[in-house]
């Protein structure tokens, strides 16, 4: 189960543990509740989406292979 709170944080609740995911314009992070550790990573760690909202007419030339 997950929800977004008033601050724009994505809160993921796992059985017995509250798992919080923080997404900002430049970084994404997550921490557990009680907050024992906070992890932050830049958003460019993840591959870009197939379609950009700013430039939908441009085709992405980046492919992901599994």
Curated annotation (Swiss-Prot):
Domain of life: Viruses
Coarse class of the protein's main subcellular location: virion
Record's keyword terms, sorted: Late protein, Virion
Stated name of the protein: Protein I177L
Induction info: Expressed in the late phase of the viral replicative cycle.
Homology family: Belongs to the asfivirus I177L family.
GO cellular component: a single term: virion component
Cellular localization per UniProt: Virion
């Amino acid at each position: 189960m997950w929800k977004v709170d008033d601050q724009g944080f994505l809160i993921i609740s796992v059985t017995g543990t509250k798992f919080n995911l923080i997404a900002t314009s430049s970084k994404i992070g997550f921490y557990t509740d009680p907050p024992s550790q906070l992890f932050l990573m830049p958003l460019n760690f993840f591959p870009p989406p197939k379609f950009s909202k700013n430039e939908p007419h441009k085709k992405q030339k980046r492919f992901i292979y599994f």
